[in-house]
């Protein structure tokens, strides 16, 4: 007989409640690097009213129930960044555990085959103050989301699972 600690369960939420305990989040993230190895990030608008307001965030979306990871990756471009659709390639997966909220994050990491143009970077959509390439070593608790810092740490040790 399994104890509660050994049981797995899933909750399908129409609207994600990020305050829910024991939450499993499956996300698609866009990891585009420039020639210096800096990663494309968005700076979320200061008035966004979310935990990420005013901070750097790696563009990403929560996957819809039953959605293919590549479709979610394309939504990062068209819905999150509101830029032209283009071919993407899966470059990795990551798993992160958040002790504070008891959340488990499973991430599909994509990059665009065709680079995002400077014109697209210079014209961020509503809700994003700025798109830029950031040296992830410059990410701090004050200027970036925990998710960005988790991804940065995982990129240092490819293949390591963080749960």
Which residues does each PLM region occupy?
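Acidic, metal-coordinating catalytic segment for phosphate/diphosphate chemistry
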Residues: 2-29
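A conserved beta-turn-beta hairpin within the catalytic core of GNAT-like acetyltransferases
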Residues: 48-54
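Charged phosphate-binding loop/patch that engages nucleotide di/tri-phosphates or the phosphate backbone
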Residues: 149-163
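Hydrophobic "anchor" residues
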Residues: 38-39
């Amino acid at each position: 007989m399994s104890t509660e600690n050994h049981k797995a369960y899933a909750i399908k939420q129409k609207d994600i409640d990020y305050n829910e305990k024991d939450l499993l989040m499956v996300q698609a993230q866009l990891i585009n690097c420039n020639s210096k190895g800096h990663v494309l990030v968005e700076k979320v608008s200061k008035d966004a009213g979310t935990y990420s307001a005013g901070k750097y965030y790696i563009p990403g979306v929560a996957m819809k129930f039953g959605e293919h990871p590549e479709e979610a990756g394309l939504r990062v471009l068209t819905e999150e960044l509101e830029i032209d659709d283009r071919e993407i390639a899966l470059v990795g997966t990551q798993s992160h555990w958040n002790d504070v909220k008891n959340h488990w994050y499973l991430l599909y990491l994509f990059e665009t085959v065709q680079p995002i143009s400077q014109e697209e970077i210079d014209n961020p959509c509503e809700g994003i103050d700025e798109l830029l390439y950031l040296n992830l070593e410059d990410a701090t608790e004050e200027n970036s989301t925990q998710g960005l810092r988790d991804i940065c740490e995982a990129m240092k040790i490819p293949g390591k699972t963080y749960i």
